[in-house]
Amino acid sequence: MMQRVLDYVLANAEKNNPSSILQNIDKFTIESGEFLMNVGPEKGKILQSTLRKHEPLKILELGAFIGYSAILIASTVGNNASLYSIDPDQNSIDISEKMVDFAGLSNKVNFINSTAELAIPKLNHPFDFVFIDHAKKRYFPDLILIEQSRLLKPSSVVFADNVGIFIDDMKEYLDHVRNSGLYKSENVASCLEYRNNVYDAVEISIME
């Protein structure tokens, strides 16, 4: 399926136009009826608004999938910003790299083919912004690992997708960002990607 999405984008989207690429991914999803676990257009607006507000220079992403959020993030932040995107699936990395290259954003995005658990301790600088959208049961342990690896600093933003629809998997994560005293955290209601009648939410947590 990921290859079919890429083929559709290459055939229909405008090269070096991130908005056109994202719109065509959305269009493929709606027309095909297949569910793609992108952040999607509705929660994407919340993500863009948060990025514009905080203007991060170093961004970490957990979960690349097909490069949708990498394109959205890289096209929203400034030219001197850089994104590091971690995903354990080689096919996801390959598709994402091609998507990002077609969007003209390869100079701002670095893909790491690894589990977050193995990659995080090897990162050697703090991040201004972390976008979490990978295996839901890994949100909490990987955030703890990020903290232990000293990859966050005061004012760092942690933006977690799907905390509404997967609430049962998010209890430890949400309890930590809301009650540990490390963050000021806000829950923003939205809808599941490409399912406007299904509730979802994002959690935006700022390290204090």
Regions found by a protein language model. Name each.
Residues Y139-E208:
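C-terminal substrate-binding/active-site "lid" region of AdoMet-derived donor-dependent transferases
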Residues L60, F131, F159:
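N-terminal Rossmann-like NAD(P) cofactor-binding module of classical short-chain dehydrogenase/reductase
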Residues P121-V130:
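A short acidic, Gly/Pro-enriched loop at the edge of an enzyme's catalytic core
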Residues A135-K136:
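Switch II (G3) loop of P-loop NTPases
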Residues L36-E117:
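SAM cofactor-binding core of SAM-dependent methyltransferases
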Residues M1-S19:
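N-terminal auxiliary segments of SAM/dcSAM-dependent transferases
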Residues T76-V77, L123, R150-L152:
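A generic alpha-to-beta junction signature in SAM-dependent methyltransferases
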Residues P56, F127-D128, S155:
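Local beta-strand N-terminus motif with an aromatic residue
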